[in-house]
């Protein structure tokens, strides 16, 4: 029995399912999860001391790669001065000013500790600001495990949502309308029916939790126009895309300004930190100046802020995102070419430093199309690559990530390995 297997067996005695977040359990792909003990650059080492080229990167935060020296040094320096204060610090002002300068739509920002906190708080804030209750979200988009957002579509286009998790009250789910991603006509229909009740539309500007789905031309602009027309708050959930697809996030890439933005992952540099921010008029509704309550013991934690500041400093280097996008395209185009050479039905797509792999003829545009991918083919590919030391997301429905530490050697090895595996199909 391998050390990974031993650890997983033992973990299941003390941790539900043996993991602290469900996707880590390999339920989607089968087999034993990898227990990591060390990371450096583009590589991670498991409990059996096997190395992997890592394309998960802790699900997106590690845009510089594992254990970047400047980030580690910043964390160490901050920790020496105290792990937490529960009081304001100069560093949290520094990162707030930086986020307001870099993100086009953010005039004020509030720091929190997780993406779920950020989206939950943004929803509450939108409801408080508009004095409305109904929310629109999109099938397959994940916005954390807040009750109001753990909702799946009903049986008809405009039926109220149903809980997608046990423990979520039907009454809570019923205030959320779930629509098809990239279907602007469906959103317009919802506004025609519920417009005066809709507090907010929340959307991943690039969907990354049903594999990767890019917005179709006009979709985000259409959401902006509809929210403006009906007085609803447009929320871009950029927990994943923020500083991953560009220095101005997805909103800068596509030229659309939301009213509120949620951030996470990259802004914490690998530490637990997130944020939500937007128009000053809306943010001023937050306590202590407004009536919408939000708080957190570890919000603005100085060690997490230090990691975030170090990371955001490095991604501002000219050419950083051009190089990252080029590396990611080299990976996806190379994988698609390798599959085509062997006659394997497969395609791939990239946006900035994130990518999707699909065992289907063309890149999906909706949740329904994602569900039509050949999951068995993906699972076989995943395990074959894992055996060769290439770690992709252990699910056919998750995006992957390239970091600045992934160089030509890592990409070339990945492509050569994939071609060998495609040849077995």
Curated annotation (Swiss-Prot):
The enzyme's E.C. designation: 5.4.3.8
Cofactors named for this entry: pyridoxal 5'-phosphate
GO molecular function (one): glutamate-1-semialdehyde 2,1-aminomutase activity
GO biological process: protoporphyrinogen IX biosynthetic process
Coiled-coil region list: none
SUPFAM superfamilies linked: PLP-dependent transferases (SSF53383)
Name this polypeptide is given: Glutamate-1-semialdehyde 2,1-aminomutase
Gene name for this UniProt entry: hemL
